[in-house]
Every structure is written in C-alpha cells, then in structure tokens.
Amino acid sequence: MLRRLLLLLVLLVGLSPTRAQAQSQPQPRRLSLSGQLRSGTEPVAGAVLALLQPADSSMLAYAITDSQGRYTLQLETALPELLLRVRSLGYRPQLRQIKAETQRLDLSLEREERLLREVLVKAQRLWAQRDTLNYLVSAYTLQQDRTIGDVLRRLPGITIEDKKVIKYQGVPINRFYIENLDLLRGRYNLATEGIKAEDVATVQVLEHHEPVRALQDQRPAQQAAINLRLKDKAKGVWSKALRLGAGAYAPGPLWDATLQASYFGKGRQQLLRYSSDNLGRDHDPAAVLYGAFVSEPTQLLELVAHGRPPVGNGLFGYRHGAHLSSLTKLADSASLSYQLHYRHQSTHGSSLTETSYLLPEGTRLQLTEDISDRTQRHATELQLSYEKNRAQSFVSSTLVLSGEWNEGRGELSSVSRRLPQAAGGTAEIGERLQALHHRTLRLNSRTRWVHRGAGGTGFEWSSTNSLSSSPQALVLEGSKLARQDLSLSTYASSNTLELLRKVETQRWTLSATAHLDARYTTLSSSLTHPDVPRGGRSELSHLHTRLALGPILRYSHGTLQGSLRLPLALGYTLLDNTPVAGERSDAQRLKLHLQPSLSLSWRLSDSYSLQAGASYSASETPWRQLLTATIMQSYRSLARYRAALHDSHAASAEARLSYRDLFSRIFAHIEAGWRRSWSDISYGTRLDEEGQRLLEAAYLPHHSERYTLTAYGRKDLDWQTTQLALSATLSRSEQELLRQGVRLHYRALGYGLQGSVGLDLTSGYRLEYDARWQGLRSELVEQRLWSGALAQRLQLSLALLNARLQAKLYAKHSHDSSLALGQRDFLFLGASLSYKPNRRLELILDGDNLSDIRSYATRRLEELEEYRSVYHLRPRSLVLSLRLTL
C-alpha cells in the first residue's frame, strides 16, 4: 500500500514543472472582465462572449449575457493579451484583441439582416456562467407538473432517487438554497415537494460548490449545490396550500391532509407544514436530512418485524408530521435560523419469511417465520443555527436537541429444519411474543470558525460535541421467556485545527492540521434468558481518545488541484467490563498510526472534469464488539464478544470522470472504485438447531476486497421533448466469513442495468418508461447461487381542456427469474384524474393497486443467507382529494 501511495505522489509531482522553470515563466494571475452589451439603447440578451488564446483561437472561458445584457468573464492566465469574440443571432459578430487584465468593457453590436426560412427561435433553456448551470424552468415544465420536484427530475444531470436523495452527476448535493439562503438546513425535500413549479424562474446548479467563502481556494469541492431563483410574484408574499382527501379500501376509510405555508422575502424566509394520512406512505419529506450530525446509532435491541416489499405498498397504519423552519438575515453575510420538527408513525403488518443459512459442510439450516407486528414511533427535534459567511472569515454555531420514543409489539411462529432432510430433523419453535421499548435523548452542538488574514494565511477550527442517553428493553413471552434491559450513555467530542495558506499565488503550499477526539461510553445490562445461565447484571465503560498531527501538502495550478494529508495519530483506549471468571474483561493500550489520504481535482476542459482520491485508515475495535457480557439483540440473536483490542485496516482508491455538453445537452460520468480491508479478528455467527444465532469473535486473520464500476449517460432531444438515460453498474467482491467457527471464502459478482425514456406523443400526451434489471452470482463452499430481477414502469400522462383536465395511467411490472416455485410475474396498475376549474382549486381522484394484488413474493441473496419472503400488500384503494391554493 505504501508503494502505491508513493507512486501517486510521484505522479502528482510530475504534473508540475521544476522550480527553476516555474520561476522563469510568468505566473498565472486571475482576471475579471465585465460589462454590458447594447445595440443602440437596447440591451442584448443571450449573446455569447468567449475569451480565446491568440496562438490557436482555442476557447479559455465563455459567458452568456443576462436579460440586461450584462456579462462577467473570469479567468486565470499568464498570457499578456487575449482575443474576445462576441456572437449573437441577428447581430454582426465581433473579434477584438484585449489586454489580459481586470477591466470593464461595454460593447455595442450592429444588427445584421439575414433571410431565414422557417426558423423558430426559442428561449435558451440551459446556459452556463463559470461553475453555475442555469435551467430555465418554463422550458422544462410540462402541463402535468405541480411542484419544482417534478421539474427537477427532468433536468439534465440531476437525478432524484427512490429515497428522495438529490444528485448531480451521480453525487449527492451539499446544499439546497432558495434565493441564495439555506432555509431548510438539510430537509430539502420540503422544498422539492412544497414549492410550486410555476413560482420558480430558474434552477441553478453550483458546480464544485464550497459553502464557506473563506475556504473556496483551499480544497477541491466534489459536490454541487442547487439554488432556486424565484419569480417576482413569489417573493415577499405568503404562499398557502391546503390538501384534503378522503377515500376507502377493504380494511376501512382513508384520509389525507396537508397544510403548508411559506414566505420567501429578501431578509426573512419561513416554511410551515403539517401532514397526516393513512395511505401507507413511508416517505416524509421532512425526514430525509442532508448533512446531519453523524451520531452513533443508539438502538442495540430490535424487534423482528415484517418486511417491506420492494414493489407495491405493504405499509398499514397512519402518520402525522409537523415542521417549522425560519431564517432571518441579520446582515449581508449573517443569518439566524431555527427549525422545529415532530413526526409520529403507527404501523402494523405481517409477512412470511424463509431464511436459508449456508453452513460449512454444504448443508443448510432453513428457518421459516410467520411475523406480525405493530409499532409506534415518535421523534422530535429543535435546531438553532447562527452563521456569518464572509470572504475572509466564517463563523457558524448550531445546537440540536432531539428525542426518539419507539414502542413495538409482535407475534411470530417459526419452524427450523436441516436441508437435506437426512442431515437433521425439524424443530418446532412455537409461538412467541416480543415487545420493544426504546428511548433516546440527544444534545448536539457544532461550532466552526475560519479566519483569513490579508496575505491569505489563517486557520480553520471546528468542534463537534454530543451527549446522548438511551434506555431500552426487549421482552420475550410464549414458548421462551426472556428479558433484556439496557441503559446506554455516550459523550463524544471531535475537534480540528487546520492552518491555511494562500494557494492562488504559488503552486505548492505546506500547512498543518491537528485533531483531538474523545468518546466515552457506559453501558449497563441486565439479562434473564434460559439459554444464558451467566446472565444477570453487567457493566461496561469504554474510553477512546485520539490525537493526530500532520502536514498538508497542496498543489494548485489553473484548474488542477490536489492535496496530500499525512496525519500521525496517537490513540489511547481504556476498557472496563464486569469481570468474567476465566476470561480477560479489561484492556488498555496506546497505539500510533499513519493515515495518509490523497485527493485530486482537475477540470480538463469546459466539458470534462476528473476527481480522484486514495486513502489508508486504521480503526480500533468498536466498543460494541468488546462486550464480554451476553446481549440479547433480538428473539433469535445473542451476542457475546472478547475484550481484545485489535485494528481493522482499510485502503481505498476511487476515480471519477464527468462529461457535460450544454449545447448538445449530454451529461455523463464513469466512476471506478477499489477497497481492501483486513483484520486479525473475525466476527461471525454460530447457529443452533432452532436457528438461534450467537454472534461471536475469534482470532482469525482475514481480508475482503471489492471493485465497483458505474457508468451513466443522459441525452435530451428537441424532437418530441425526448429524454434518454442509461446507467450500468458492475461489482465484484471477495471476503472471508466466519460461520460455525469455520472460515469460509465467499465470492460475489453483481451487475445492474437501468434505462429510461420519455417523450411527447403529441401535444398534451406524454409517455415515460423506465426499467431496471439486477443480477447477483455468488459462490460459497462449492455452492453457486444466482438471483435476478426485472422491474419496469410505464406511465401515460394526458392533458385535456387546456390542461384543466389531466389523467395519469401507470403500470408496474416485476419479474423474478430466481423464484423456482410460485408466481414470478406481478403487474400493478394505478391511475390519477385531476380537474382544475381555476388557478386556486383542483380536484384529484387517485386509484392505487387497481389490479388488487394482495401478496408479493421475492428472493434475495446476502452473503451467507438466502431469503424468500411473501409480503402482504394494501388492497385496491380510491381517494378523492381537494387541493386549494389560498
């Protein structure tokens, strides 16, 4: 691994000329050219200005004038002179030589009369200004679109996944602004599903976006941000919308209610939302949170619950949610915001699952479970934030208080047997009742301070602290009586100090960074279980601290940026378990690690950009895998580990090449990744004849390796407003697993293909089709398994009576070729009919699962297990809703 890192460093150094050459050549400098284009007294909008290299007329930068004819061109160059070319339809082109210096240049264009035959000039729908892409919303909006989220799904380069994650060129965004303000602080789906498409003028994608202005020259930004530019009619006014719906399905009545109010002013923004329904929606737009505090999960105990079907709707119950966001702009660069969020969800359901555990001797242990459960979940959060973002300084402070309360009860019956049958008998486990109680209270704070001096030097300091308490209990009744009580408390602090240097004036800069982290965890456990005679009470305390110091070497030349970090980390761990006879329960150690990382960003041209990185890390055994006491994690799972401190090592590398052509409207990227991990301790499972699992640790050096390759392409055509997208994935993994105390070698090859097409059949009639095919081949102890599934969706949208009457018809089909018995193909039908008599009122009739499919079967593979599940689905339903804009 060290040899590979040295090779990457040599390649990075080789991209730069020698120091003597750099001193003899002119140093590149940044210039800004701005002005206004006019023809007489009228501004010229949509004109293209390009800066060219005099030697070969190659393009260095370009810009497009706005509605007032204004433009701004920025460039870093060492040339003394440049060529400026100006072109616009209907005007005589210009080409002039200018000095390569910051200046204001107002230009006048002369009209040019040309005879054009049957030429239709449309408003420009997509244009770029440096690292900002601008999408004209009206050019991408269809008659059936209601929210800005409907339009975002159609914009080239932007995708919204099933879990509502917004991505640009396959990478999740890091900010979602509304008029350049971050009102929602990570709950960005409130905007995509709550802001009307007709209120947005332009969607901007800020490529390579660094939110902190004082750090924009320090590190290559990998993510993009989205900014919504609203129309004037939507600014400074309250926008209110109400939706009320009622309907029915076989189990009983249905309801749907949503109320939202928003205000987007110049110095103040607010959004309020309340929603409630029993339609089986598992998505809450306020629940998907970008960039949240990374807190360690506190729930150690789980209720074995019914599964969720990948196709169809298997969620029964209801939910309520309320959210309030408010932001006040104190000055041009300072803002104060707060958020209050609450959600409650009650669910119930049932499923039948058959799990086959692959065993070392080539046999299988098959566990069949009939599960039904009912859960209640409550969550609330209060967030206060202050931010001051200036060119030379940045201050941010956030305080979050959150709580969760989960209650669950379930019934299950299970049968286990050995396959082939001759290898063993059948064990009837009988009926069991399970109950889960879980509470969590968290307090998180984050402070960040960046300061830059006049010469560009400065520092960045950040501190993140968290305090949490989580009591929880799991109770089993029926054929086996058991009870597990836990009380978990954690305090964590992460602090970073980094020195900053100005990187624009020189290619190489050297700075330093320091980290001080600490985490203290205490756990109290009480277990009563017939299979664990040494249950009773037990305690754990775990302290881990880490001090890291190291240099940061940065390289910057034009559009090429890279950084090499070499932190040397000193870690100290102190572990204290309740004594166990004949075993070691306490441990402590001091360990030194070198954890280098390399990142590279290179904008090869206006169309191509490259990002790459490599890293090595070493992490110590987490406290969860140091418990010497037995913990009942679920009705079928017991965990007991050893107090052995060891390191897990990982090395990874990834590269990503992105392409975009605005004029041809082509967006594409290809990404490759590699990761290898190794450790001296293996964690595996030991199964008894009833399918009960004991999670254990053993000294067994092992490793795992994984390769991934992803490709994506998107093309838009003017013909019938056609959109084409295609993506492919390939993954290969090898790892060593522990089952029944035996090391097993596991291999897997996964692949997937996904495509979509959308086009207008005629005015008001649009057809959209997407399909996804996935396959997996695995090999274990001469057992070869294969699974494959196809899912496709077809939707026809119709707009009649000047779009006042709209209809949507859709069909979903799934095929699982790996199901040996039973039904392999399922077809789901749905429809929606809406009538809008005026701008404020809309009536909507929704029909779900019109084919009335009540059950759905799947098969999937996961390392040493094979799952076959039968899900119970919601039957046919009809809901009539009224949507009113107030």
Residue ranges: model-predicted function:
Residues A55-R70:
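Short, acidic Ser/Thr/Gly-rich low-complexity loop/linker segments typical of extracellular
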Residues A331-Q345, T375-R417, G425-T578, R603, ...:
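Face-selective signature of the C-terminal outer-membrane beta-barrel domain
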Residues Q21-S32, Q68-R70, L79, L89-Q103, ...:
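Membrane-proximal, glycine/serine-rich, low-complexity loop/turn segments characteristic
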Residues G752-W773, Q783-L886:
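Conserved C-terminal beta-signal and adjacent last beta-strands/turns
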Residues S138, R219-A221, V288-F293, T353-G362, ...:
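Flexible, surface-exposed loop regions and adjacent strand-edge segments
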Residues Y572-N577, D606-S652, W674-G691, S851-L864, ...:
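Surface-exposed extracellular loop regions of Gram-negative outer-membrane beta-barrel proteins
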Residues S39-P54, L79:
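Short, ordered, surface-exposed loop/turn motifs in non-cytosolic proteins
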